[in-house]
């Protein structure tokens, strides 16, 4: 009887563990806004200007996305980190906008367009 109990417990334990490399499953769905976190400042893509930005409007690369949270984070208590973005892939460059202070606005390419991200202040 003891060997059967041990086998049963081992099977139960194995079923409860996740295999390395297996996709994670979330019980919580987060509805992300289109943001990028640079340092302690969160920038959000709000309504875009009537005239879309062009390549010539972009200044120097200011930062790069380090981590895409959408599809990878399901903890509603997750604390944003420098380089996090909702929908931009890791490695995406974040640009300064010519004539705009970086503390107010930045830009990035998303879904075939150049979007303006407006500073919302330090993240909590």
Where is each model-derived feature located?
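Short, exposed beta-strand-loop hairpins at the edges of beta-sheets
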Residues: 96-99, 104-112
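Mature extracytoplasmic domains of secretory-pathway proteins
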Residues: 31-99
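C-terminal motif of bacterial Sec signal peptides marking the signal peptidase cleavage site
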Residues: 13-16
